Amino acid sequence: IENDKRGIEKLRLAYKNVLFAVPKNVYIIGMMNTADRSLAIMDYALRRRFSFYEIEPAFGKDNFKNHLKANGVTESMIKKINDNFIALNNYIADEKNSGLGSGFRIGHSYFCTKPNCDEDKWYANIIKFEIQPMLEEYWFDEKDKVGEWMGKIK
């Protein structure tokens, strides 16, 4: 929230006869997927009122590797995840080839849950039920591109 909207000065709420102030030590943290085109109009309003911090996908980063290890994921699967999604995200970020751009890169959170089955099945389920539908939406009119990348990351 803007600094001039914080502190001891209270404002009367529009729909209730109540005074309200946001304390200086209260922070509002929200998350937004910038790839969601339906948020575009709201996005401009939010950007005027809040500070934004972009979180980069953590593929290839030590913290992500350590998290996967702590969840019991093998070194070979960690390498597979990182290699596949670094390559896919590099392609997605190249707007000229992908038609998308860096705001459409796939985040690491899909792989942050502890595997609840064999890790190959865990990975295959994430690809089939999380990643593939997203790629099909991204490239809804380019089935060959979806097929190509599904073949590369399976």
Where are these regions (language model features)?
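C-terminal regulatory/interaction module of P-loop NTP-utilizing enzymes
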Residues: 1-154
